[in-house]
Amino acid sequence: MSKKNERKKIISLVKERASFLFSTNEISITKAAKKACKELDVEFDDNMRRTISRHLKINGITNNVSEADIEETDVFKEAKNKEIDKSKKRFIFSWCQSETEIHDGFLTNIEEYAKHIDASIHIIAGRYKNPTSIQSNKNTKAKEKNLTNSWHPRVVPYLDANRHKIHENLCLLSDVKIQPTASTPLSGLNGMTGLESCIVGHPRVHLKSLPILDGYPHKLLLSTGSVSVENYTDTKSGKKGEFHHTLGFVIVEIDGDDFHIRQVQCEDDGSFYDLKYFVSDGEIMLHSGVEAIVFGDLHLGETNEDVMNTSFELSNYLKCNDIILHDVFNGHSISHHERNQPFQLLKREQDKTDSLFTELTEMLQFFDTNSEYNFVMVRSNHDEFLDRWLNDVDWRKANNKTEYLRLANLLIEDKDGKGIIPKFLSVTKNDNVICLGIDESYRIKEWECGMHGHIGSNGSRGGVIQFKNLNTKNITGHTHTPCREDGHCSVGTLTHLRVGYNKGASSWMNSNFVIYPNGKGHHVHIINNKFTTL
């Protein structure tokens, strides 16, 4: 053996002996180092003391393991080399903070669910930069902690700090460390993965659909949720992080050239719903039905019939009869946007889409055809097209004169002020429809579902920041773009993804939102007329 290798072996023995002495005799690092050197007949100096001190930190024997030391552990090095099982078609991704307890029941349920659906589990290795983290500040003796690595032992087999290409159009960015207190974990990631959607590890559950050019694959950014419990400082940023901390995971199903992706959250006891399944105490069951589904904006006349039919298939699959609707009426026959466009008006005249009677009849037929469902129709901006038309135009010079006079008489009788569409539906006796007014609340479990999204605070234009800052969780429509940011979610659309006026790059997606009996919920995207492989 060379002198160099012999020296390494001796130093390794000194480090192990010093670790044992420090852990069992409650002596200082310096005393443990001196004693180990004396026993093994090795010269003690300050370099040796620092070497042993670093060894104790890296192996979690001393408190306040630094971020750099954590990343030198064998556990993290293995996580950096983690590989994806290419034979799997389903994956579950979550996140875990170092030096932090996990929710045992939740992880057990994830493991059992993964076995049931044949999924591979990956848990992204999270690190909290703040050294005053409550967990590491506990007055616990080093020997009592007796840590051999910096993550909970149960997550170590799944720990991931590598970057993976899950699918031709989907990446997992386990190598991107985002502070758990970051309020917008998806910011700055838009161009990082090119054409590919990407998943990042973070205890907040956020979702963004990015604008793409026509013909390109949809691009989503998602964060995972956590399997570790809250562990934050008592600072403002720490308390905000604690409030938004969510136990959850992302599930991915590979479906040939496509993939399906959902963000699942659990209850306090670790139980969770995912589509038709309810998982609790390690058991996988078929549940009796979901609470409600919020459909993407409908816009009859521009609706993609295949997507709408698939959405009703989703309702039947989830045993759901209660459906929230946005922008049922489109208003293309009387749109103020086209009032001064003579050639567009001529085109509508030629293809018979300028008939208000036909458009109203299609709406009635929609509710009659789907009479087995209970609908709640949220007051939307396209509903207001018709009220605006009645107020603005001179009926003597306009098309649709007969419908104008008929609806004008109804509007005069509108005592509750909800507008002409609700009044029209009440007269035609559609008993399976509840029509909301513009400021009328409609709550389902924890969610406010009575806002369309076109009006924000104090009459301003609605937006994500306004809605996520409201004092209640809420689901809106209007943007045709699925989004999730803290307590705010918006649905996509059930229309064709190109309808003429959304020129340029578009973030529109065919996407609905499911609300489960426990009050949790997530988006279900319709991809090529499918929503799952389960």
What are these regions (language model features)?
Residues K3-K4, K8-K9, K31, K35, ...:
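Extended recognition/assembly regions associated with phosphoester-bond processing machinery
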